[in-house]
Every structure is written in structure tokens, then in C-alpha cells.
Amino acid sequence: MATDKVIPMTRPEDRHVHAEHDGKVDNQTVHVSKSAGHQVTWFSARKAVIAFSSPSGSPFEETIFHVPAGGSVSSGPAKPTAEAEKHYKYSVVGEKGVNDPTVIIHN
């Protein structure tokens, strides 16, 4: 009898951030290790947009991430050019507000 392999949606080493409808998050500052291959996974019960639009840009390949209602989206690993110990501000745009948390990259 064949069995389906269950693949987890996130990895244990992912950094999880839950966004609310007002843009607030449960993890205001996220620490990401390039050498460990950490990723950020954003979750939201409602639609949300994650946007790295500050002059520092994004530490990830993409600058905008769309979180579907009731779903999640992952950043992928930090790009090689992401600066260590740098604070990357981003905006979380929820249906009823905006918040500006931070991702900090470590080697």
C-alpha cells in the first residue's frame, strides 16, 4: 500500500511571523542567519503584503511578498549580498493598518 509523504510547509529553522489585520506582528524583530540558511515565513488569517521598500532594500531576492488569507509565504534564504548586522525595515500592510518591523541579518 502506497503512503503519501507529508512535507511540512515550513522548516524548523524558519523564523515565523504572524501578521494581524492591522499590520501588527507577533515578532517585531526577526534575526536571520545566512550561514544557517534561515528564512522568514509570514502567516496571516487575512491577506497581507510584506514590502521591503526602505533605502536599505531587501535582504532577500524578492522585495514584495503577498500572504494569502489563511496562508503563508516564505522569504527564501538571505541573498549573498545581504549585509551582516544590518537592520532591514519592512512594512506589513494589513486590511486595517500598516506596521514597520525589522529583519536583522547575521553571518
What is the meaning of each model-derived region?
Residues 50-54:
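Short, hydrophobic/aromatic beta-strand segments
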Residues 1:
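Extracellular cell-wall/glycan-interacting regions and their flexible linkers
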Residues 43-49:
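Short proline/glycine-enriched turn/loop motifs at strand-loop junctions of beta-rich domains
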Residues 56-61:
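Short, solvent-exposed loop/linker segments at beta-strand-coil boundaries, enriched for Pro/Gly
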Residues 30, 62-66:
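Beta-strand-rich interaction surfaces with strong enrichment in secreted/lumenal proteins
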Residues 65-107:
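Extracellular/periplasmic metallocenter environments
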Residues 4-39:
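N-terminal edge beta-strand
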